Amino acid sequence: MKKLTTNEIRKMWLDFFKEKNHHFLEPVSLIPVEDPSLLWINSGVATLKPYFDGRKTPPSPRLTNSQKAIRTNDIENVGVTARHHTMFEMLGNFSIGDYFKKEAISFAWELLTSDKWFAIPVEKLYITVFNEDIEAYEYWINDIGIKQDHIFRLTRDTNFWDVGQGPCGPNTEIFFDRGEKWDKENIGPRLLAEDIENDRYIEIWNIVFSQFNNDGFNNYSELPRKNIDTGAGLERIASIFQDTPTNFETDIFWPTIKQIENICDANFKYSIENYFDEKAEQTKINTAFKVIADHVRATSFAIADGVFPGNKDRGYIIRRLIRRALMKGMELGINGPFLSTLVINVIDVMKDFYPYLLEKQNLIETTILIEEEKFLKTLSKGYEALNKMIENDKKVTGKNALLLFESYGYPIEQTIEIAEDRKVKVEIEEFNSLLEQAKEQARNARKDLKAWDKQNEIFTKINVESEFTGWEETSHKNAKIVYIFTDDEILTEATDKEVYVILDKTPFYAEKGGQAADKGYLVNKEARCEVIDTQQGPNHQHIHKILLDGSIKIGDQIDAFVDETKRTLTMKNHSGTHLIHSALRVVLGETVMQSGSYNDEHGLRMDFTYNDSIKAEELIAAEKLVLDKINEKINREVYFCSMKDAVSKYGALAFFTEKYDDIVRVVKFGDFSSELCGGTHVDNTIDIEDFMITGLESKGSGVYRVKCLTSKKAINEYLNTEFNKLLKLIQEQNSKYENTKLIQADQNIENIVKESVTKTISKESIQELKLILEKLSAALKIYERKIEDLLTSKKLEQFKAFEPITNDKGVGTIEQQVNGLNIKDMKNLVDEYKNKFEKLIIILTSETEEGNFVVVGVSEKIQNEYSAIEIFKNLTISPKGGGNSSLAQGKF
């Protein structure tokens, strides 16, 4: 059999299907786009959903890809099984209403067995089919020539793909027989027939025949357009061609494993032979190597695609992978950060097909190193907190486990492992319940979805043509109405109601890429329509949500007018977003990467990644750089080109969380800024007029959000509002001082207030007033403490003349009412008397608006004979409280 590298296998697959007229789809980001149902891209077909459900027209009915994917539902199995991975590559070929069963089976067989391609011996291949799929079974037997003892008809459990509702169908699977060496009990084909987990028969290809629709009640009807969805695990195929016990000894992971051997304690080595030897200690060592190699690969790709360690969603998964790998390193005697040094091994293996990893190398290494260092600190703090919990409660409550998770970022898996070592229980059900409550709150906050986000049947049927003209115009005469619908039905006409309409040509920008939707009006003789929102449809149509006054029908001509004021302000802010992004990359470094943005007529905000603290002077420098570029009067340039040219020829920044078409739009402002962007922008940077950063906040885990304004009018309004707001806050603070000034004046406060009066409205004065407010607040706190101490001292003075009544043993007793004193003042008074008299029992009571209090004190010298807590318990007023032999306190 051929010996093929992973790169050769991938290339051969893609070349084969290109010869069969399949369009090659470049691999996309691990972060799903416009699919809230998925946390990660988890299969090859996940990226093709819009093509299969009709929302978008595919570039070809025949498609092929090699798509990276992540599945994290059972991370704990990684390293334990032979073929389980966090991230994997799925080879696929797909037909959308084109070929079906016979062609799909023929293609698979040709690629696997032809001497030109994989050249796998026919006798090594076994097939399974759904037992009711006679067509597929007979084709395998009669046309392909599979022997009866090499094909098995299995049940719905193994050979029918169905998620409960929607398209579904039977599937056929192809297995490779690795031979008796991998079948210790010599069970043979029964392993397949009875679906027994094994390492002899390796599934290399799954072909799903999507031919039915499940109505949700298990009623099945034939689909009018049948599809093919296939998947073949690249790592599994590599293991077959390289004849390795598991996927981890292939050329994908082996360089990383060998590098781990160089880093770890010399006593630890990876053993290939242990697959057969099964020595428990070596199995544990091998597992650690596998986990590290797997997790560092998945983490590297995720970070390159814009996911950073955090405490929720994808960020938590990446944090968990890094921390789990770091813990496995400790099992191999590695006690410091080391994962970042393995990134280069991952890149060397994967760079041919994923060249962008090289560009992201510094970002990946820095992010992982920072997270490693954080976790080493977290381990120490979290471990201390966990120990206290175990000592105090003899268990870990769900509430405490959540506290460790949220406050310390301490993984629940780590809490469980440590608790098990200490033989104590973790109330995991309570933890899961509390965690689910937190998630539910987050989900509820996101439930305000637009009608078209429901992707209902009406929406997916939209296939009319619509052209966007709004890059160069804000109005369009005689546009034709080509589609009218509501949430519930498709219409041919409408009168006086809220509906959605599509025009053959429209200047209205649909919300996308961080830019808010245009609003405005549609007008003709019969109707005036207020456009209150614009969103993008399944094939790039711009869908207008309108409040209709009058009547419209399909085919009507109508004039479209965008709200120019809103559009102009939005354009300034969108161009400002591009400039501040470039400025931050200049000031902070090219590891800065935009991870989200939003701009409308009110301002702009941009989220970006940066793994360090940001100094005020760095923000000032970025703001100044943007202002410089505005004043340089740089013309906007726009180019339509291929993605390759956009990056190589025009230096455009592309964000891997976005999906791009074959032809992309590049927006450039000289050599300073070049980005892929479909939004509207100013013609020249001078049109932005002005620029100001109004805020910076950390979103956690290396993600920041910067908020900015453009245009002189918006900035002047902001400065006026902020200036007056800050002055009001300063005046409020000063009023607190004035109310107590007669007790004791404070020159420092008066000087600070005088300083604020000298300021006039400007960008600089806003920052200065903020500093003045901070200084004033701090000075006022010190002043208030002084006044409180002074008033307390005066209040206590009237109660300092009590004299004890002394018994024959020389022990004095003071029993007095000190009404108006709080418990703190009473304790201070008791301490003063105890210091004044060596042998004293003192009992003070106080009636206040907050309640009635009692404090009992006993001097240290007589505590062998008298106890404050015992005296407290025997008081006739029956107080409730506690204490010790020296002091007791409570209420009555």
UniProtKB/Swiss-Prot annotation:
Keywords: Aminoacyl-tRNA synthetase, ATP-binding, Cytoplasm, Ligase, Metal-binding, Nucleotide-binding, Protein biosynthesis, RNA-binding, tRNA-binding, Zinc. Its main location: cytoplasm. Belongs to the class-II aminoacyl-tRNA synthetase family. Consists of three domains; the N-terminal catalytic domain, the editing domain and the C-terminal C-Ala domain. The editing domain removes incorrectly charged amino acids, while the C-Ala domain, along with tRNA(Ala), serves as a bridge to cooperatively bring together the editing and aminoacylation centers thus stimulating deacylation of misacylated tRNAs. GO terms for cellular component: cytosol. Zn(2+) binds at H574, H578, C677, H681. Binds 1 zinc ion per subunit. PANTHER family: ALANINE--TRNA LIGASE, CYTOPLASMIC, ALANYL-TRNA SYNTHETASE. Its cofactor is Zn(2+). It is an enzyme of class 6 (ligase). The lineage of its organism: Bacteria, Bacillati, Mycoplasmatota, Mollicutes, Entomoplasmatales. SUPFAM superfamilies: Class II aaRS and biotin synthetases (SSF55681), Putative anticodon-binding domain of alanyl-tRNA synthetase (AlaRS) (SSF101353), ThrRS/AlaRS common domain (SSF55186), Translation proteins (SSF50447). It is found in: Cytoplasm. InterPro entries: aa-tRNA-synth_II/BPL/LPL, Ala-tRNA-lgiase_IIc, Ala-tRNA-ligase_IIc_anticod-bd, Ala-tRNA-synth_IIc_core, Ala-tRNA-synth_IIc_N, Ala-tRNA_ligase, Ala_tRNA_ligase_euk/bac, Thr/Ala-tRNA-synth_IIc_edit. GO terms for biological process: alanyl-tRNA aminoacylation. The gene is alaS. Its EC number is 6.1.1.7. This is Alanine--tRNA ligase. The keyword Zinc applies. It catalyses: tRNA(Ala) + L-alanine + ATP = L-alanyl-tRNA(Ala) + AMP + diphosphate. One of its GO terms (molecular function) is tRNA binding. Catalyzes the attachment of alanine to tRNA(Ala) in a two-step reaction: alanine is first activated by ATP to form Ala-AMP and then transferred to the acceptor end of tRNA(Ala). Also edits incorrectly charged Ser-tRNA(Ala) and Gly-tRNA(Ala) via its editing domain.
